[in-house]
Amino acid sequence: MQNRNFNNLIIKWAIRLISIMIIINTIFWSSISEAFPIYAQQGYENPREATGRIVCANCHLAKKPVDIEVPQSVLPNTVFEAVVKIPYDMQIKQVLANGKKGSLNVGAVLILPEGFELAPSDRIPPEMKEKIGNLFFQPYSNDKKNILVIGPVPGKKYSEMVFPILSPDPATNKEAHFLKYPIYVGGNRGRGQIYPDGSKSNNTVYNASITGKVSKIFRKEKGGYEITIDDISDGHKVVDISAAGPELIISEGELVKVDQPLTNNPNVGGFGQGDAEVVLQDPLRIQGLLLFFGSVILAQIFLVLKKKQFEKVQLAEMNF
C-alpha cells in the first residue's frame, strides 16, 4: 500500500514537472519564433525575392544601413571572411514584447552564390575563430546551404559579425566556374513591426480605425490601452486596442481621423540590405600572370644591360 502511494506521488510530481517544462518551452520558443530571422525561414522558401528585395523588410519597416566586406578575389577551396556590419546607436533602448525597454538584438542573412557555403570548423583558422566569437551560423534550409542566417544576438557585442565562408572548387564541383559572383546581405537591428500573419507587434504605431471622438481611454492592467471612439457619422462606438509599449499621443474628448496615429512610434531599429562582389580566381591564371610579369621584368633587365654594353662599345670606339 505504501509502495502504491509512493508510486502515485512520483507520477504526480513527474506530471507536474513535465507540465512546467512544456510551459517554459512554449514561452521560450514563442519568444524565439517572434525573432528574426526564423520568421523568414518558416514563411519563405527563398529569402530574396525576384525583385532583389530581401523578405525581412516585410516585417522590419524602417530602413537602416548595413555594410558587407569581402575579399576582391578568392582561390578555390579556401576559407575567407565576409564581414557584416550593422551599425546603430548603442545607447538607445527598444520596446520589448512585455512593453518594457531593453537592449537591441541584431540578425543577418547572407546570400552566397551557389557552391559557396559555411566553412567547416576544422577549416577555420584560429585567428578567424577569435573574430567569430560565440556566433552560431546555420543554413537557411537543407537544400540552401549557400544562404546563412544568424540571430537574434546581442547588438552591443555583435554589431559586426564575421562569417567564415568556404569557396567552391570547379575541379570537383562542375556547377562552379571561375567568374565574378554577387553576394547579398540583409541585416536588422531591433524587433519588427509586423508579424508574418499581418498582425502588429507592440513595436509600432497604432492608428484610429474610424473618424470620430475619443470618448474613453482605459489603461489595461498589463499595459496598453483600450481607446473608445464614437463614430462621427452615426455615433456607434469602436474600441481600438494598443499593446503595451507605445505611448498615447491623444486624450479623451479629442477628435481623430481614420488612420490618425493614436500612439507614438517606439521603433528605434530597422532593416537594410547590401551587396558585394567576389571573383573566384583560377590559380593557373595567377601563375600565368606572374610569369608574364616576370618575363616583362627580365626583358627590362636585359634591355638595360644591353644598353650599357652598347654604351661601353661606343665609348671604346671613341677612345680608339
From Swiss-Prot:
HAMAP family: Cytb6_f_cytF (MF_00610). This is Cytochrome f. The keyword Transferase does not apply. The chain crosses the membrane at residues 286-305. Component of the cytochrome b6-f complex, which mediates electron transfer between photosystem II (PSII) and photosystem I (PSI), cyclic electron flow around PSI, and state transitions. Residues 1-35 form the signal peptide. The lineage of its organism: Eukaryota, Viridiplantae, Streptophyta, Embryophyta, Marchantiophyta. One of its GO terms (molecular function) is electron transfer activity. Belongs to the cytochrome f family.
